[in-house]
C-alpha cells in the first residue's frame, strides 16, 4: 500500500510539473492566438481594467491593490511624479506575479523632445528640415526613457497648426502637411525602431486625432469647423504617415469636429482610422477627455459618456476612470455590446504583446544613469539644435570675427537655463549650456566677453541680445493674443542699437512671433526656438561660424497678429493678391521655408522625366545645386507644386518634397 501511494504521488508531481502553460504565455505562439487565448480567460472586470489608465501618484495607497485585482491596464506618469525605475519594476512585479492572469502594466510618459537629454522643441526640430537627425534624436530619447522603465511616449504630435496664438504650435511641425507627415513618421521610427519590443525601444502614441491644431482663434480646446475634405487633405495625412510607420497607439483629441467631439467620433476613429487605414493598435483618450464629453453636451452622465467613447472607438481612457466604474452595468443592461469591450481589450493586449511586455516585463536598465546624457546624446543634441536655428537677417555682422575686441552678451536668456520649452521630460536645467557659457568658450583669446551687468558701458563691437518667451508662455493652453516679444525686450534692442552697437538678436521662442519692431534695429536676427540641453554651444557654433546656419522656417512669421491665421498654402481666389488689409498686405514678415546661411547656392538644370503625364502617372524632377560660396554648408532643396486647372480649388503652392544636402565650396550635386 505504501508503495502504491508513493507511486501515485510521484505521478501527480510529474503531471503537475509538465502542466501546459497557457497559450498566451508562449512567446513562440502567433500574436493573434496569444491575444485570443488571454481574452477568453478574462472576466469583464479584468477586461475593463485593461482599458483604464489612471495617473500614477506616489501617495496613492490603493494602487497596489488595484493592480493586484487586474484593474489597471496602464499608468500615465506625469512630469514631476518621479517614478523611479525600481518603483516601476515593483509595481510591474505586482501585476505579473500577484494578479490572477499576470497581465503587465504599460507605463506611459511624455517624452516629447527628449527624456533627460533635451533636443529642440518639435517646432524647432522641424525647422532643421532634417528628418534623419530627428529620427536619431527620438532613438536617443527612447533609449534613455526605456532605461528608466518607460514603455510608451505620448508623441509625436502631428497636428497641422496655422495660428501662432495657439500655444501648442510648439509641439508639432508647423503649418505644412508634408512636414508634419515626414517628421511624425521619422519620430515613430526613432522611438520604435523595426521592433518596438527590443531593449531601448518604446511605443509611440500619435496625437491628437484629429483637427486639434485648428482650434478657433488659437484658443486651446476650442471647437473646429472642418469639412471632410479639409480633414482628408490637411489634417489626416500626417496621422496616416505615422500609422504607416507602425505607430502602436493613437490619442484622440479634446476638440469637437464640426459638432462631434473627437473622442466620440466614429467617422475618424472607426471608419477612417480602423477600417480605411487598417490600424490595429489602440486608441487612447487625451487627459480626462471621456469625462469631458459631458461638458461638450453630448452625454447626460459619465455612463453615457463612456458608452459613446468606447462605441466610437476610444479603447483606453486616460485618468477619467469611467470605463472601470460604469461599463459593467452598461454591458449588463445591454446599453453596450460586450463585443465592443472585447474589440478594445484585444487592441490593448495586441500592443502589450507587440511591445514585449509579456516576455520582458521588467525593462529598466540595471544602471539607468549610465544611459543618460551620453557623449553621443549631447553631440546629437548640439547638431540638431544648430540645424534647427534659422537665420532671418544678416547685414554682414555674422559670423563674428575672432579679432573682435569686445562682445557684450545681454538679455534675459543670456544666462537663463529656461531653454527646454514647456514639455521638459526628466530634463534638469543644470545640464543646460547657457548662451553666456557657449560664447565664452568659443570667443577669441583677445576678445573681451562680458555680461551687460559687468560693464559700465553698453558700447562694444557687438552686442548679442538674447530675448524670447519663457516655457510657460507656450505649450498646452498657453495661448497669446499678443505675439510680440514680452517684458520690454523690444526697447532693450532699440536702445542698444541707438548707442551705436552692432546688434545680434537671438530669439528663444516657442511659436512664430511678430518681430516687425525688432527687424529695423537688428543687424542679425537668429531664431533659436527653445533648443534644449546644448543650447549655448549650438548658438555659439553659429555665431562664430563653426557651422553655417541651415534651418528653414516650418511656419510663417506674421507682420501683425491681425493677419492670423496665416500660412503659405492657402487656396487661390478669383482675385489673387487682393486679399489684403487696409493697413498692410497679406504677406508674412518672413515666409515658410525661408532661412539664410553664410554661403550662397545656385540652382540650375531643372529636369522633368516627362512634360505630359496622364492621371496616376508619376513625374520625377531633378535639379543641380552648387555651393558658390566659400564655406561648407547645408542647403534644403524644396519642391513645390501648383495645379493650375484642377477639379477643385487648390493651394497656390504646395510642398511635395524636399532634400537637405551638404556641399563643400564649389561642389555640385543633383537631387
Segments from the language model and where they lie:
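Sec-dependent N-terminal signal peptides
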Residues: 4-12
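Glycoside hydrolase catalytic-domain context in secreted enzymes
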Residues: 12-671
